[in-house]
Amino acid sequence: MEQHIVLTKNLTKKFGKQTSVSGLEMKIKKGQIYGFLGPNGAGKTTTIRMLLGLIKPTKGDIQLFGQDIRKHRLQILRRIGSLVESPSYYGNLTGRENLEVIRRVRDLPEARIAEVLEIVRLSKVADRLAKEYSLGMKQRLGIAAALMSKPDLLVLDEPTNGLDPAGIHEIRELIKELPDQYGMTVLVSSHLLSEIDQMATQVGIIMNGKLIFQDDIEELRKKQKPLLKIGANNIHEAQSIIQKRGLHVKLQEGNLWISETSPEFVSEINGILVQSGVSVYRLEEVKRSLEDIFLELTGTEGSL
């Protein structure tokens, strides 16, 4: 039984003197949606290209379905569907005709076209020219093409990039259905934390070519321990009073932040500040977002 659909060891890719991916240890379980998260230029697409055999690693090993890609490349790739960057299609052919081209090349059953059109919800527009499709419909056509061979692993590189909110929602809901309804494992990359949060069951965060976090999405959410937000008339004096009691407090955007939020602690801190002549006008428990966790993990100050 395959423990991991994707398993890499010390996966590294250099372009000249520049290291794009460094020592990557990716582990993707069967039947999961693995969200591969990182800012543009972090190494996501380079990693995906290595997994698909499009470029060779500088060093390291790649196992897909328990097999070494160097020894069983063609056998492995038959079990993978992919959409890397933008979809490829013939604009002067209909959506159905585009899939017919793929069906003939791969010698697939004719019925498969109708099946994938239904999966990606393009059945009603299947006979329109592909060049007349919206960007979201073109993305779904690209996913349909990737699904033609009934892959065990579907690899999608930034599938929601450039889409409007409605298009993003359509792609997200489509991806979420694939493991349960069709038994697929999905690797989806994105620079949008909110997208990964809403559809992934596993997450890997890559930064400057290095995987800095990898676990179930729930483990990432467990890091969302709430903080106590304090607003006071003399914020610097309040900070000094709290620090003198040996507590770690952070001043940010005119408010103090403390990691302890128990009712007893909040009451005690409020009493200490008031007795010291500090007028407290805000005591608020704030749950940290996943973006806050990302910034903490990466040590960056900006958003994805």
Regions found by a protein language model. Give the residues of each.
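Short, charged/small-residue-rich alpha-helical element at the C-terminal edge
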Residues: 228-297, 304
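Generic structural signal for individual residues within well-ordered alpha-helical segments
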Residues: 77, 99-100, 114-117, 169, ...
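Residues at or immediately preceding the N-termini of alpha-helices
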Residues: 69, 73, 217, 235, ...
